[in-house]
């Protein structure tokens, strides 16, 4: 018990971070990179993540519970609707919603739809994350950032590659 008390200081922070985006936006890959090893399944096949998945990251001054969600998309069947519902519910009662946009694919109507869902979230910080920057030129990554920036109001923005 004493160890826990000394661990939980005023400087210690903790919270829930939900990752959302279109299928194959890099949500599971980002979780694996932050955790430091493969804990989430990754695949080029859309809808590999079918259930919300939580990964706990603990550092000296913080603990973050990252919530991986199914890719959000225009549903064509009941499964698609259920996956979207799961992702939308994962944005409830969290501290941060990270909206991931793939730098290698043009921002489109799917991203616009996901951004609308993120805009509906109240009480959470919203972070725009441009992923897969290693697959495009710096100029393209900046263009993607600008296009995605127009989809909402963001508390923070980051362009990254989870691979390196």
Predicted regions and their residues:
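Conserved G1/Walker A P-loop phosphate-binding module
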Residues: 2-96, 101
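P-loop/Walker A NTP-binding module and the surrounding RecA-like catalytic core of P-loop NTPases
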Residues: 25-29, 109-110, 136-139
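Conserved nucleotide-binding/hydrolysis micro-motifs of P-loop NTPases
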Residues: 46-48, 70-73, 103-107, 133-136, ...
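Charged helix-capping and loop-helix junction motifs
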Residues: 81-83, 112-113, 142-145
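Structural signature of beta-strand start/N-cap positions in the alpha/beta core
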Residues: 96, 125-127
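Amphipathic helical hotspot of TIR/SEFIR-family domains
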Residues: 108-120
């Amino acid at each position: 018990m004493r160890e826990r008390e000394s661990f939980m200081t005023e400087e210690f922070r903790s919270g829930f971070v939900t990752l959302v985006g279109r299928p194959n936006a890099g949500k599971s890959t980002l979780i694996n990179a932050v955790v430091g090893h493969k804990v989430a399944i990754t695949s080029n096949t859309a809808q590999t993540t079918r259930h919300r998945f939580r990964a706990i990251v603990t550092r000296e001054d913080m603990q973050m519970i990252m919530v991986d969600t199914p890719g959000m998309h225009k549903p064509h069947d009941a499964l698609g609707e259920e996956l979207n519902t799961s992702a939308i519910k994962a944005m409830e009662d969290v501290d941060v919603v990270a909206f991931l946009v793939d730098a290698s694919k043009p921002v489109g109507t799917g991203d616009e739809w996901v951004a609308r869902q993120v805009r509906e979230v109240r009480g959470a910080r919203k972070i725009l994350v441009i992923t897969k920057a290693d697959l495009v030129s710096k100029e393209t990554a900046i263009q993607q950032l600008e296009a995605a920036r127009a989809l909402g109001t963001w508390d923070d923005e980051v362009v990254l590659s989870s691979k390196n």
